Amino acid sequence: MISLKGKKIVDLTDELVARVARIDGSIEQGTDDAYGHKWLSEETINETDGTMEHLVGANIGTVSDWPIGGLSGHMGAHIQLGVRHNDNWTGLPDGMKGIWDVPLTTYYGEACVCVLDNVRGRPILPEHLSNVREGDIVLLTSCWSGDEQPTLVGDTAYWLAEEKKIKMLGVGVPGISWETNYDGPEPDNSPTHRAMTGNNIPIVYPLANIGSLKQDRVFFISLPLNVERMEGTWVRAIAIEEE
């Protein structure tokens, strides 16, 4: 029998509070994710059995700062791969996969914890990631925010993907500025996306509480929804470490 005795489970996802449009017309405001996105929902009645349910999303135009109403799989903590996400970019290799194409074992395993408080406002270099082993899931965070966050530059992203052959990249936000040149011209835009998804390495973010982990190696689990054709899905990410 599998036992978690002597182990501690750490939640690496921030709690979101949904904005709910109630049946009576009232609105209960919620909280934003790390990127300022709201979790929108609408209360309704299931006519089959009379139970109350919540539809994910809102009527178009009813939320001024998110007028499209619909939610994507990229709100809150989520995981993404390249197919149907950035395989429309030029310069990416053949053979890219979607979330649904890779084995479930891709999404859990041994992870190294990289707390980069000492890299304040500077590029993250391989020398800062000396605890990363080949095939690791890599969890990055720092205590910094805004312009003081360490930045994952393209050369280091490719080093992780192609030399260390990491299994998955998990990023604390705020804490790490993990993408550069995202608005640049192709094929030089978004090197971290290109390094990871071009090598079929999932990215999971925005994560929280990585800095609370006590060990620099943990067991990490972040399972996507089992929905084909979705380029990104919401996750509940956890780490398991020794107490």
Spans of model-derived segments:
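Active-/binding-site microenvironments in catalytic and ligand-binding cores
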Residues: 1-243
